[in-house]
Amino acid sequence: MFRFVQQSQLRKAWVPNQLVSASRNSLHAQNSLRFNSAAAVERTAETVGGGANGYGGSGDAGAPLDRAVNKVRSMRRGFKLGKSFPKPPSPESPWYHKVCAFDEYVASSLNAGNETGSAGWAKSQRATMFWDSITKAMNLYRELLLSQELTQARVSRLLSLLHLALKINRSNMTGLNKKPDYDSQSFHKTMTNYLYASFKEISQDVLNGQVTVAHVGAFHLLESFRELLLAEEAVLLWRTATASEKPGLVAPFMHPDPVGIMLPLLHEGGMTFEEVSALYEKCKKGQNPTALHCLTLGMIKVCLSAGANAEAVGLFQEICSLPGNSVSKATLTGIHLAFIGECKDLQLATVFFNRALSGETPYKMNIHVSSVKQLLQNIWDQTEDFEQVFDVWRRASNYYVGLSSQGIFSSLNSKFFEIFFQKYRNDKVAGMQHLMEIITGYNEIRSVDEPFLNIILTKCVVWKDLEIIENIEESYQIYQLSKSIVSCRILLKAMGCVEVSNEQIYSRWLRLVQKADQIGQTYIANADWAALRDATVGYIHQNQKEEHADSPENLATSYPDYNPALEAANASGAFDSDLPFGEHGNAIKKHIIATDDRSELYFRMVKKFGQYCRDSKQLVRITRGITESYPFTKEYSDNFMSMDVSDIQMPKLVNLRSKSQLFASYF
């Protein structure tokens, strides 16, 4: 047909040493006002423009390391740490040694964070010490709650440190070639959850009056919740604090900086534009204009959201008219990005986007991919002009070439192809032709890689065409790419959108299990079981839904440990060596699966391979646990233990560990 041309539970007291050691993986920190996206680099005019063919433009592949050196340095310089270092306690205090240790851990970690841009820092002992000091500081914080030594300054500096750690951890995740499995005990996942638990703990202590914070601490606390995509928790914290009668609690949360964080969140939560404006004026009154940057940024975002573009431009002009270097780079960048991504006036948004691309700004501009994605969505929502969407995507891709991690491209491409398949949902012939052109053109910008094809493969299932899926699979070989376990999961999962035999699904499942074994997994992960589920019972469930009402195709995948902080990383694929299917592919016989009932196939596979579950809880979750979402599977679940699977072949496995005793404790 077509062929291509070319929130989990953590022990609060500690983080395992082996996970701290994992922090030696590269840290590409960045200054980001958004959760999952920044390419903090300086660009030359040559790297911005496209070539004559409309796709051209390639970055300097050797320059990113030097540019990355300044990422966290820039971020660290812009951090609000407070002007005064906490006054040391009296040597006669019984808490003296613990307070000194607390101050030392916080200070040394903040200093280490300032060095994360250096080329050798990520692999040095200091990287491990940075994360270890954070956990030790939190342990001492809990012990010092009984004392009177946790001053506003100390608590605020601790929150500054935790916020910096959150940014560094997020930057690491953005730089990964592959996002962690949702059931894996990855360092990034563990630290994200640990940091969230720490923020939550301190916020409760603040509200309970056990500790107080300065406005700097309130800023970092609220901003951290926002960056974790936990707007409701930020709003609840702010409303509770500002309505409190406890002394010293209202003032720091009503300071212009924390309120600047809250204005857009409050507006999104239902506060009217007039009410937000009144709060803005209240906080602004009597303040030095040079101290209102964060507040003004928040109000500009609200104006753009409400369509008050003239007011937003006026506020921006006020900021730009302030003298000298009184306005931080982070503020100017944040305002510029707000106009790109949050302005509904496409002409105005495009002007800001073009100026950022060309460097025609009096300040250094770093375009965050989240703002570009918002612009793409706004263009499509308002005009459905795909050519305009394509133009912005192409130019943004040229901008990021050689300057950004894989996660940035995966995030941008995911949004672009989401829109692409909306346009061509009902015209796969024209869509496939255009897709071939896009892939060829993209290969001129940067080499087609596995994550790029994974995204296409994931989204092309709306066409429900097995031949297209297989042709896309062939493109991995065309572009000389090895399929990782992520690709194997996607291919199995895609079987839930097309008419295929159980024999074909079984074949895909065996390849996935063998791949898991080949890369060293010791148990079959949740993501692997989810792919099997979506290919089998998910297929039946979707057909039942379509029989009752027309509904958009949405091949859903749920993970029990879903975490927005991980999801925001949005990078898929890894460059593992591929595993040949081998003899087992040829040995499959039609009588292995006696029926084409996909529900029965699912439970038979679980019965055969369930011995490779992580534990009994996982086994119960993938059997009895799915009956609530898929009631039609209850019959099979009830008869699960009596199923005969002796006719199903078991491939030779090396690393997966059999736990046959799981079935003994199943009941």
Swiss-Prot record:
Q: How is it modified after translation?
A: Phosphorylated. Phosphorylation promotes binding to RNA.
- Membrane topology reported for the UniProt record: Peripheral membrane protein
Q: Name one GO cellular component term.
A: mitochondrial inner membrane
User: Looking at the keywords, is Phosphoprotein present?
Assistant: yes
Keywords, ordered alphabetically: Membrane, Mitochondrion, Mitochondrion inner membrane, Phosphoprotein, Sporulation, Transit peptide
Range annotated as the organelle transit peptide:
1-12
User: What GO terms in the biological process aspect are recorded for it?
Assistant: sporulation resulting in formation of a cellular spore
Q: Which domain of life is it from?
A: Eukaryota
Cellular compartment(s):
Mitochondrion inner membrane
According to its UniProt entry, what is the function of this protein? Binds the 3'-UTR of mitochondrial mRNAs. Involved in the processing or stability of mitochondrial mRNAs.
Identify its protein family: Belongs to the RMD9 family.
Q: Self-association or partners: how does it assemble?
A: Monomer.
Q: What is this protein called?
A: RNA-binding protein RMD9, mitochondrial
- What species is this protein from? Eremothecium gossypii (strain ATCC 10895 / CBS 109.51 / FGSC 9923 / NRRL Y-1056)
